[in-house]
């Protein structure tokens, strides 16, 4: 059943020995569409279209059984005029994602003609899930940042550090989700290696999670270990 939510070996110097990763990332595919509302349309129209599309197209086949939709509305960012909303489609694999795209191309014409938005950017990504919030999900919130690793550091090392950080954070009451997102075709070019996603099952929990970080996690050994691998994170935005 499609879910709709409102609201991505190191060689040792001189030794040439392989270093095993502490954790094995589980990758999934995700498609991000930045949208502008057509004249006279708003978020309610987009939400209604998504629900209607589920009923009239997606539910008619098992191709979308593992497909999940998330809608974002930008709240904080450097340019809130760039787009009005983001449609995120989550898939377990590239095979399922492109099978879904193929079905939509062949069978989604009538629904596509009624879409209340124009797409201004479409990005194909891979995502590594680090942690996920527990409990029933409501209207949530997500913070994105473009991050660059220090020279000589690879993504698996950063993932290991994020996992250790998330495990330690949970012991302090943290209930936030985290992902490393690797943008592909359609991505905005820039000096970054991945996009970091920090998300909460409710808007309020993103705020309480931030307070918990500064009170209980900042400066911990896991926090320092993570910072030792990351050169910088920038272009923070919240939806």
Enumerate the language-model features and the residues they cover:
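Hydrophobic h-region of N-terminal signal peptides that target proteins for export
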Residues: 9-18
